[in-house]
UniProtKB/Swiss-Prot annotation:
PANTHER family: GALECTIN (PTHR11346), GALECTIN-4 (PTHR11346:SF32). GO terms for biological process: antibacterial peptide biosynthetic process; cell adhesion. It holds the Pfam family Gal-bind_lectin. SUPFAM superfamilies: Concanavalin A-like lectins/glucanases (SSF49899). InterPro entries: ConA-like_dom_sf, Galectin-like, Galectin_CRD. Monomer. A beta-D-galactoside binds at W256, G257, S258, E259, E260, K261, K262. This is Galectin-4. Keywords: Lectin, Phosphoprotein, Repeat. Residues 19-150, 194-323 form the Galectin domain. Signal peptide: none annotated.
Length: 323
């Protein structure tokens, strides 16, 4: 079952190293680049480059380079005309060998803001115009789980969604009316419990994106699609880390229905990051985790358009939610 990203959300899952790919739509103010991965047990260094062009020796607008060398530090620099500029350094290491991490670059008008595992880490002022950046390069002692470009495609509030310029591997462009859509603005690092209002209700083809982290001691958390006026829950997703299950159910007229538990894989391990895409179809929800189909859940609330609230609570840290 092919995963087709919603416009404005361009993920690549399990990319191989070295990674060197164009940035969909180019770099723009307000764009975020999410990199989820695992640092090697024997990590010495890795780097992320925001590159001007695809040719060898191209300028590097921003070079981000963690180094485990006895003086654990992160180095920041710019390569222009074949020459490195003056280094900026931070003698602090936010990455742990063998541990999962989430690295976010937020592109702002004056600088790149770097966030690691939800914590602001550094701000690097632009030395080259950000509009010149065309490619992202990643390599070194790490394993990549996902790279997501978020906010690079302008979304139109009315009319059909825009065509994503770079379909993922094995994906072809879909008809406009079959593409998933995202309606609301993204929320970064929201607190838990989280309550989000689905403006206009839950419509067919609407996609909800949830990126988060399961703490090592986490026991369970829940994602609920609710009808605010009645308290009905059209879809209850409940990962339970203790027994490795992902329970789905509905609460209608005050009564829980029958649980569904079958999954092909479980992305909600303790100490793991996850990337969840929940799509509302005409007859079911389709749920993908880290780019792989996780489960379908047939609508039990036939008037699913009445769902107007997204609720997330429990043992989870959220890094990004878009409804």
């Amino acid at each position: 079952m092919a995963y087709v990203p919603a416009p404005g959300y361009q993920p690549t899952y399990n990319p191989t190293l070295p990674y060197y790919q164009p940035i969909p739509g180019g770099l723009n103010v307000g764009m975020s680049v999410y990199i989820q991965g695992v640092a090697s047990e024997h990590m010495k260094r890795f780097f992320v480059n925001f590159v001007v062009g695809q040719d060898p020796g191209s300028d590097v607008a921003f070079h981000f380079n963690p180094r485990f060398d006895g003086w654990d530090k992160v180095v920041f620099n710019t390569l222009q005309g074949g020459k490195w500029g003056s280094e900026e350094r931070k003698r602090s290491m936010p990455f742990k060998k063998g541990a999962a991490f989430e690295l976010v670059f937020i592109v702002l008008a004056e600088h790149y803001k770097v966030v690691v595992n939800g914590n602001p880490f550094y701000e690097y002022g632009h030395r080259l115009p950000l509009q010149m950046v065309t490619h992202l390069q990643v390599d070194g002692d790490l394993q990549l789980q996902s790279i997501n470009f978020i906010g690079g495609q302008p979304l139109r509030p009315q009319g059909p969604p825009m065509m994503p310029p770079y379909p993922g591997p094995g994906h072809c462009h879909q008809q406009l009316n079959s593409l998933p859509t995202m309606e609301g603005p993204p929320t970064f690092n929201p607190p838990v419990p989280y309550f989000g209002r689905l403006q206009g209700g839950l419509t067919a083809r609407r996609t909800i994106i949830i990126k988060g982290y399961v703490p090592p001691t986490g026991k369970s958390f829940a994602i609920n699609f609710k009808v605010g006026s009645s308290g009905d829950i059209a879809l209850h997703i409940n990962p339970r880390m203790g027994n490795g299950t992902v329970v789905r159910n509905s609460l209608l007229n005050g009564s829980w229905g029958s649980e569904e538990k079958k999954i092909t894989h479980n992305p909600f391990g303790p100490g793991q990051f996850f990337d969840l895409s929940i799509r509302c179809g005409l007859d079911r929800f389709k749920v993908y985790a880290n780019g792989q189909h996780l489960f379908d859940f047939a609508h039990r609330l036939s008037a699913f358009q009445r769902v107007d609230t997204l609720e997330i609570q429990g043992d989870v840290t959220l890094s990004y939610v878009q409804i």
